[in-house]
Amino acid sequence: VLGWDPAFRTGCKLAVVDPTGKVLDTVIIYPTAPQKRVEDAKKLLRDLIAKYNVYLISLGNGTASRESEQVIVELLKEIPQKVRYVIVNEAGASVYSASKLATEEFPTFDVGQRSAVSIARRLQDPLSELVKIDPKSIGVGQYQHDMNQKHLGESLEGVVEDCVNKVGVDLNTASASLLEYISGINKALAKNIVAYREEHGAFTNRKQLLKVAKLGPKAFEQCAGFMRISGGENPLDATSVHPETYQAATELLEKLGFSSQDLKRGGLAGIGRKIRDYKAMAKELGIGEITLRDLVSELEKPARDPRDEMPVSYTHLRAHETLSDV
């Protein structure tokens, strides 16, 4: 993904990140006024797209966004690669890029480069980036400054914590800041998880968490159920089913004529109707009835996420469109 932080005088900052959010390259181009070096910008963009197999451009919606968008639309008509672009809300990105956290994460980057990285990562995993920003900086209502700031901060932090643990995190894209909110994970462990991922590549199963420095069985027991791995070795790793319940889940699926591989199709809708007696089935599996009902609910719709029901908040033009067509 290529993140694009648009600007006029100071130039547009670009950052390319891999699927896990690791920064691969950063450059500055000047396609907008006053310099308008459009062709130079296009050449740099072509090189980046070809070198890193960029398939998606994440464009911030701030100053010079429309002018930058026009350059992207023209470029996409000229290149053979199939690249799409999305306009991303960059609220709070400037606050993050100038923060102590951003300085620790990217000590050699300037503010603009950090902002471009944040914009790219917001498209991959919005929650992972938004937790790095003080919730008050995003704008939570016109009367937020009239409230007791301490109470407001505590309430907003509580909402973020509940949200993160309710929907879980993608273990292969989550930032250290996001991982800190997970039960059993502190700041040091969060950094160790990210460091392990950057050194060894993407996680393929939850058990690999036990190889992370200082992450022992107790921490694993607390955090594993909130960690998701999409496309991993075990389809159950992409659900909220805890590893302790994997054996029961596998036995249940076998009794009902399925396997964990069937979950890859997006869940087993209606599987609960095949269980005539929950109490008896729970006893057979050696788990509680409430646990069984939770297990069935998750197998019917793995990684249930309330955000899926929200309207899409971004817009993008197709490559052949221009602003005059809209």
Regions found by a protein language model. Give the residues of each.
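Phosphate- and other anionic-substrate recognition elements at nucleic-acid/protein interfaces
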Residues: 1-4, 9-157
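Short, contiguous strand/loop micro-motifs
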Residues: 31-32, 59, 106-107, 162-166, ...
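Residues that form generic nucleotide/phosphate-binding pockets
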Residues: 48, 126, 155, 159-163, ...
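Charge-patterned, long linear interaction tracts outside catalytic cores
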Residues: 125-196
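Accessory alpha-helical DNA-binding modules that contact the DNA backbone or grooves
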Residues: 166-300
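Edge strands and adjacent loops of beta-rich recognition modules
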Residues: 306-314
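Conserved small/polar residues in nucleotide/adenosyl-binding loops
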Residues: 315-322
